[in-house]
Amino acid sequence: MAQKDVLTDLSRVRNFGIMAHIDAGKTTTTERILYYTGINYKIGEVHDGAATMDWMEQEQERGITITSAATTTFWKDNQLNIIDTPGHVDFTVEVERNLRVLDGAVAVFDGKEGVEPQSEQVWRQADKYDVPRICFVNKMDKIGADFYFSVRTMGERLGANAVPIQLPVGAEADFEGVVDLVEMNAKVWRGETKLGETYDTVEIPADLAEQAEEYRTKLLEVVAESDEHLLEKYLGGEELTVDEIKGAIRKLTIASEIYPVLCGSAFKNKGVQPMLDAVVDYLPSPLDVPPAIGHAPAKEDEEVVRKATTDEPFAALAFKIATHPFFGKLTYIRVYSGTVESGSQVINATKGKKERLGKLFQMHSNKENPVDRASAGHIYAVIGLKDTTTGDTLSDPNQQIVLESMTFPDPVIEVAIEPKTKSDQEKLSLSIQKLAEEDPTFKVHLDSETGQTVIGGMGELHLDILVDRMRREFKVEANVGKPQVAYKETIKRLVQNVEYTHKKQTGGSGQFAKVIINLEPFTGEEGATYEFESKVTGGRIPREYIPSVDAGAQDAMQYGVLAGYPLVNLKVTLLDGAYHEVDSSEMAFKIAGSQVLKKAAALAQPVILEPIMAVEVTTPEDYMGDVIGDLNSRRGQIQAMEERAGARVVRAHVPLSEMFGYVGDLRSKTQGRANYSMVFDSYSEVPANVSKEIIAKATGE
């Protein structure tokens, strides 16, 4: 099938992602979509490591998706730009950046498990960016699959207004198809239509008629309430047409007021086509989402708006960087407005640097289709960008805009890495630079005491895979240390009028700076961990020196006063100070700012913070006592216990430092019958006895 031209009619474009828990079947679902829309001639299976969207070697080995590939495909004359996102918690960054550039999403759930911890986390991220979603309850052929239970957990755990628009026909091995509550018919996949290309539309089976009526009524009530005209018609006993119902569901879905629920089994090729119809019918096109809002470069209060049309000036967001074996660095961009031709010059408005676009591609997983120009509403990969990193805005040089970037969490776990030979040292530096470009949650620093390179990430699996990629892609041989927890430090009380005078009078020009500050605990909006305010009056410190005090204080925050961990959640208020006409300089005030912060922090009841993980253990009832006892011994706090599909589920908050090696311990305590998942929850204060140990270790006592 020849690729059609990029549709200029944006109402027929859908940019959407597939998001879910690790094993709910996202990649399989995506593979089926590619098969039915005619890109793939043979269905790739995760089981045999041939899935198209999983294109790094490790993804095919581990059977999980790590980096999200963007793919363009067509369905019934609509263009679908699909992004497959990883479901494993250690790859939050991938999910986060994709949600930022998607207009809608399909949330895939495992029909047996319902809402799992990871689904909750991904769902919350999607709420943050207000992404409209439809839900697909997958794996309906599994033993123990329960559609109604899954829908219930969406309400209970996600607080989502989930509205079924399909019901399953048959269950487990006898799962045959779906009841369509909008058209009031059944779609069944009979016999072994090996790949499920064809299905029959039949009457609703008699044993489901009553249930279908009940759910149809619920659906119609929701639909009617959304529109006065429909409400009058419905209350007057008139039938609503299929188009009216679809129009209302679309309106409610785009407003994130409801989440339509569908079901099927991607692996058994049942229910995928109706899900594609639902993507087109209910998820927003680039025209349905609010215009992109940004600000003028270096003027954050000057708002700039770009509508999704080709007439507006060019604006795009770089949301992912990947290393391609042949082209080198590939930058994925979402174009929000205007058009741009390959080879033209644009500006990276975030950094104020000029960039020239090399070739432009529309991607199919890891194959490329070259295009001449990129236009509003679409997703492309581009080569040739030098300075652009994730979250940067590319724009028209004459009409610049900086779009809202993304926030990335700090690493919670670190390992030291040492190259085995001199030649590995160079390869290591190169590989770290390349990987850090691709993944903003991968952080690197040099440990000033040991001289080792320390890499940080979002979890053990995340770091395993990064180290694995260094070995494979960059041929680095390195020794990796034991994982270390990324502790932080903060203060608990306000200290006032702390002063510090920096002076040095030795022949020639001296140095002089005096500062007086208040230091207090600070909790900013999400992500903000520091604030600086100057209350200096009457020119007691010249205005040009005040930023130096701020910079010095921020430098001092890199190494805390207790054990050298970064200081967070502080507010510094500069009250007063003094300067010397000749001897004062920016440097002098920077040193004073740094020293006064250290002095104040030591007086402000400093404490150590540790990362706390939300852990969920699923275990047979016989081992329940052992599991809880073990979590308690790891300083865990049990949050809740519940029953799910015949097993017990324990939810607890446990410090990350106590969770190393948990896999093996849990396996031996439960004879391999329990499993667990954990996601980062928050930082909290370390108990005094543990704090002493951490300080002793850090100070080498």
From Swiss-Prot:
Pfam families noted in UniProt: EFG_C, EFG_III, EFG_IV, GTP_EFTU, GTP_EFTU_D2
Any one Gene Ontology cellular component term annotated for this protein: cytoplasm
CDD domains: EF-G, EFG_III, EFG_mtEFG1_IV, EFG_mtEFG_C, EFG_mtEFG_II
Molecular function (Gene Ontology), one example: GTPase activity
Places the protein is found: Cytoplasm
Cross-link (Isoglutamyl lysine isopeptide (Lys-Gln) (interchain with Q-Cter in protein Pup)): K307
Keywords in alphabetical order: Cytoplasm, Elongation factor, GTP-binding, Isopeptide bond, Nucleotide-binding, Protein biosynthesis, Ubl conjugation
Family: Belongs to the TRAFAC class translation factor GTPase superfamily. Classic translation factor GTPase family. EF-G/EF-2 subfamily.
HAMAP family for this protein: EF_G_EF_2_B
Protein name: Elongation factor G
Source organism per UniProt: Mycobacterium tuberculosis (strain ATCC 25618 / H37Rv)
